[in-house]
Each structure stands twice: as structure tokens, then as C-alpha cells.
Amino acid sequence: MNKQDVSHESLTLGRYYKQIRERRGYTYADIASDYLHSSQISRFEKGINMFSATCLLLAIQGLDMTPAEFFALMPQDQFSRHYRILKEMSHYAMICNPSDMEHLKIKGPKKQIDKIYNIIVKLAGAKEIGNSDITSQERRYVYQYLSSIQRWTVLDIQIFSSCLNVLELKEAFLFGLDILKCDDLSNLLGLHASEVKKAMVHLHMHLVYGEYYSRANHIKAELDALLDVSDMEEKIMLHVFDCLAQYKQNKDQNTLEELENCIQVLRACELSDLAKRISDAIKKT
């Protein structure tokens, strides 16, 4: 069974549990125990009652699964509304339609995560890099949020990647190193490899744009060790921005020709906005 086997419609945890139970062919009686009754499982699946943490662990154990296996099958966009909307927001940012993003803002945000999220919407809606009208207070808020993280989650990594333009280059680099060196990296890569790798590629791009070349090379070396043959998109982006970094430093004609070829490839792949940014960076060199 894999993630494609699980319906991607909006799920409550109970409905998701029911899908997994039925696909594995387990009945309530198969899962029930002295500490977990069939009626409790039924009410949980119907959304009538929530499980305690202990009951949820027993219910997962009853499926002969570990918690990691159970949640690994869960469609990633079901983990949180912020995770889901961040993906939608990325789409708007890519097609350069910032006016469509206003409706994504949370009205009267009170939670810390909601305030951070609104800052990300504001950043993504900017028409140009560095033209987002982010206040010093908002920059401080993002920095304090990221600094307070003790264990990185995939949502935190998405927030970090989305907020690079808010951070000083040195801050962004150090947060990236913290992710790459964290104790949970192997678990994060096991469940969310694509998100982690894309965030690090984004960091490398950001450091090259900011002419922080030695640090960009450090991140590239880390990525070279992480990326495998299936990460073609990430490998291409890493190559393009490595070429850009070399050209910005050496003004080599051969590197310029390679970059021009890369720009044509990006345009052919409908990444014209990124191609334009690279072209503009070359002109400013």
C-alpha cells in the first residue's frame, strides 16, 4: 500500500483510520482489546468521539503498524491546513498572479502560526524579490519563530524556505545548516525527502542571488551527498545556479554559454519567470 492508494479527499483522522483499516481487511473485533472497545473505534471513525493519545496508539498497533508507518501513508496535504494552503500559494506565486493571493490571508490572526502564514502570503505576493513591504517587526517575528524551533517538522522547513527573503543571508545559511545537522534529518528524509531537498535547493539559489558564494558552495556540497538519481529537477536547479555563481565570480564566456543554454531549457519547461530572474542576474553582473 502507498500514498496513492489512499483517497486524497479532505479527511478527518477517523475517516483516514477507517480507510486504512478497511484496505488492510481488519474488523473492529480484530483491533479491539481489553483497553480499546469496538464501539470506541466505531465512534472515532464516524467523528463522534476523538481518541486519547493512548487509544490512538492502541488502534494503530491493532492494525499491526507502527505510528510512523501509519502517518507515512497519510496524504501530505492532510497534515495541516497551513501545509495544504502553502502548496496552493506556491502555485499562485509561480504563475505571478499576486492579486489572487489576498483571499489566502487569515483575517485577524491570533495564533503565532497564522501570523507567520500571513507574512508568507505577503512575501509570495510580491511582484519582485526584495519588494514585499515586509516590516522590521515582521522580520523579527519570523526570525524569532525559526530560532525557537527545537525539532524541525516538514511545516517548519516549508516556512523557512518560504521566508528566505525575510532573513539575513548569514541567518538563512545557519538555519539551513541546523536543518541539515538536526537529529531528525533521517526521519524527515524518510517521510518528506522531496520537501527537504527542495528547501535546501531554494536556500542554495538564495545564497547565489545574494552573492554569498562560499556558503552556497557549502550547501551545494551537502546537497550533492543527499540527492540521488531520481532527484533530476533538484540536480538541474543545482547545476544552473552553480553555473550562475561561477559566472558572477569569473565572467567566463564558456560558463555564460552554458547559462544561456540553461535559460532556454527553463523556458521550454515553462519556468519563464525563473529564466528571467537568471537572465536579469547575468545582466547585472
List each language-model region with its residue ranges:
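DNA major-groove recognition helix of helix-turn-helix/homeodomain DNA-binding modules
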Residues: 54-69
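Short, charged recognition helix plus adjacent turn
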Residues: 72-99, 264
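Helix-turn-helix repeat elements of alpha-solenoid scaffolds
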Residues: 91-104, 130-140, 169-181, 210-221, ...
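Amphipathic alpha-helical segments of tetratricopeptide repeats
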Residues: 105-106, 143-147, 180-187, 220-228, ...
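Mid-protein regulatory/catalytic core that forms ligand/cofactor-binding pockets
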Residues: 109-209
